[in-house]
A protein has these predicted regions:
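Ser/Thr/Pro/Gly-rich low-complexity linker/stalk segments immediately outside membranes or between
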Residues: 26-51, 55
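N-terminal Sec-pathway targeting helices
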Residues: 1-15
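Hydrophobic alpha-helical membrane-insertion segments, chiefly the h-region
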Residues: 15-26
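Histidine-/acidic-rich catalytic cores in large beta-rich domains
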Residues: 71-140, 144, 168-171, 178-182, ...
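Short alpha-helical hairpin
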Residues: 145-149
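Compositionally biased, low-complexity repeat tracts
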Residues: 49, 67-71, 160-164, 400, ...
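Long lumenal/extracellular ectodomains of secretory and single-pass membrane proteins
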Residues: 49-84
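Solvent-exposed serine/threonine-rich low-complexity stretches and specific carbohydrate-binding patches
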Residues: 150-165
Length: 603
């Protein structure tokens, strides 16, 4: 009996020791994984002060594999496009994809002799397509380096769209190439145990920016101690003017004369935290106000009359014409195959920025869903009477959010109003509520009833209300407004709260327009809206340098990104009124967002 007890005790001790060892090993592994993740995040912040030297400095010249886009040694696939419009031809893009597929089938490609193509689909001038196979399942991490002490390395983990990001077949875009310089691309292949299998470095000369974009922005480092967020700044900006001289034949004698033509070139630009240009997405004569990831594609305005979907390799999957309409602001996706676009009808006497059209991704059908001239008929009629023209710019839709089934929130800049509209799919859309200064709607009795009341919050609600008699004795004046409503707002975002009927609405209050008490500042506003109570409350307010036209602000947990359009700059700051970093531009930006593109270009 004693012998059995002894055996049991020894067994238990061994099991405890074994379990402890396993837990220690697991904790040690978890710690190492966490440390590696933090190291990767630091490396991907694209800041010189956080990088220990440059990747290219560690590579011997003899080990660099040169890539050539032209000449006798050409080993990079290149594609010619006659125009930006041709880039966004889905048929042209499909033909290019078919050509690359044929090349892949006819030859075996390893990392040493990988298939390279420079911007094959024309949709990103700062990217290279690469394809190769490995013997085992693995993933790739790449670094873009240039011999310039002022430009940091750009490092990311490529996404393979395979389980655990491990695959034997590697096909991705190397992003972040620097325009106008010799770029050194180092690809590191890791096995399933995160062990480095092989490293190769390639060199390639990248052309200058076609759009005339600044290769490096002038930056100012602020006093904030907050760590700058990871990601790329997505800049929607006014186009740069280019002057060309053309020969024009005219007159009976058909004399050739020189004619000066001024055109603007537009592009969506991607900048890193150091202000270095890392992406240039060309657009045709127009730059939109936002882009959206829809399934495995990015959608953005490729021209004033078209929206395009582009996959992670840069291929144009589909381009949708907005038949009969021009884009005039944002678009938004409802999650069910429908895109809603702020638009202007192409008719001669159409009111600008007054329509919302629906684009069905399934078949490209375009249908007008909201006409503000009809929805706010009394306001429109008064504007027509005052201006004596039917195509008066009276409403200025500039932002749109889908907030429920057949429901949307619209921002009308000219009216300094946020308008929630329902019954979008019906012939008679209706207004659920309006957020605006009450005095703006006093002339319109039916609309005035839709304006939500301001709430001072729970603390004010707990205060005892004075009786009429006491008010009369003390001659107490009417309680002042708890806050000023927004005027001339831009870039609205909507988030549903868990409490039924409640939502958070964030926006840039430009603090400009009719009826405003101007003080030279714009503001970040966050409202708590309670539809059930018919109220809205100002929960957050941050003062900013004023921009009266365009601009936006996106709020994060520790920081925000603010685009000051009038000031021609954008800034990342903390919530203690301190700048983390400011970026100065040579032309007016419309909007600036920050995205890490994880799950699309990067893992």
């Amino acid at each position: 009996m004693k012998g059995k007890i002894k055996v049991i005790i020894i067994t238990m001790v061994v099991l405890l020791i074994g379990t402890g060892a396993l837990l220690w090993k697991f904790n040690d592994m978890s710690k190492k994984i966490a440390e590696q993740e933090q190291e990767n995040l630091k490396e991907e912040r694209d800041l010189l002060e956080e990088q220990n030297g440059k990747a290219i400095d560690e590579v011997k010249e003899v080990d660099i594999i040169p890539l050539y886009m032209s000449g006798d040694k050409k080993n990079v696939v290149t594609t010619e496009f006659s125009s930006i419009k041709e880039i966004y031809s889905a048929k042209k893009s499909a033909d290019i994809e078919e050509n690359l597929t044929t090349i892949k089938k006819n030859k075996s490609f390893s990392l040493d002799n990988a298939l390279w193509a420079y911007n094959p689909y024309g949709t990103n001038r700062n990217a290279m397509y690469v394809y190769f196979k490995t013997s085992g399942r693995s993933y790739c991490r790449y670094t873009v380096s240039v011999k310039d002490s002022k430009i940091p390395d750009f490092t990311r983990t490529a996404i393979s769209n395979a389980s655990g990001n491990l695959t034997k077949e590697h096909e991705f875009q190397v992003m972040g190439l620097v325009a106008g310089k010799t770029n050194y691309i180092t690809i590191r292949v890791y096995n399933s145990n995160d062990e480095l299998s092989v490293t190769r470095t390639f060199s390639v000369d990248i052309p200058k920016s076609r759009a005339g974009a600044a290769g490096s922005l002038k930056t100012v480092k602020g006093r904030s101690k907050t760590t700058i967020s990871n990601g790329l700044y997505v800049v929607f900006q006014d186009g740069k003017e280019f002057t060309t001289t053309k020969k024009v034949v005219s007159g009976k004698k058909k004399k050739a004369k020189k004619k000066t033509v001024v055109t603007k070139r537009y592009a969506i630009l991607l900048y890193d935290n150091s202000g270095v240009l890392r992406g240039e997405i060309p657009t045709d004569g127009y730059c939109g106000r936002n882009l959206e990831q829809i399934y495995d594609t990015l959608m953005y305005a490729s021209s004033e009359t078209e929206l395009s979907q582009v996959n992670a390799l840069g291929q144009v999957i589909q381009t949708f014409p907005l038949n009969g309409y021009r884009q005039a602001g944002e678009f938004t996706y409802d999650g069910y195959g429908n895109v809603y676009v702020i638009a202007t009808a192409k008719e001669k006497k159409a009111t600008p920025k007054s329509k919302v059209v629906e684009l069905k991704l399934e078949d490209g059908t375009v249908t007008q869903k909201v006409d503000m001239d009809t929805l706010l008929k009394s306001v429109y009629r008064k504007a027509v009477k005052s201006s004596k023209k039917k195509n008066v710019d009276w409403v200025g839709l500039n932002s749109i959010q889908v907030v429920g089934t057949n429901q949307m929130l619209l921002s009308a800049k000219k009216l300094s109003s946020l308008i929630k509209v329902s019954n979008i799919g019906s012939l008679l859309p209706k207004i659920d509520y309006i957020i605006a200064d009450e005095k703006l709607y006093k002339p319109y009795k039916s609309l005035a009833k839709k304006v939500l009341k301001k709430s001072a919050g729970e603390e004010a609600a707990d205060e005892p209300e004075e009786t009429p008699a006491v008010n009369n004795i003390l001659r107490k004046e009417k309680k002042p407004d708890p806050f000023e409503a927004q005027f001339g707002q831009e870039a609205v975002t909507y988030k549903q709260r868990s409490t039924e009927g409640q939502s958070n609405i964030s926006l840039l209050n430009s603090n400009s327009g009719n009826g405003v008490k101007a003080n030279g500042e714009s503001y970040y506003y966050r409202y708590l809206v309670d539809e059930t109570a018919g109220t809205y409350e100002l929960k957050d307010k941050t003062a900013l340098d004023q921009t009266k036209k365009d601009g936006n602000i996106t709020a994060g947990k520790d920081s925000y990104v603010y685009c000051c359009s009038d000031g021609k700059y954008f800034v990342e700051g903390d919530w203690n009124d301190r700048i983390i970093r400011q970026y100065n531009l040579d032309r007016r930006p419309y909007r600036v967002y920050k995205k890490d593109f994880k799950g699309f270009w990067f893992y």
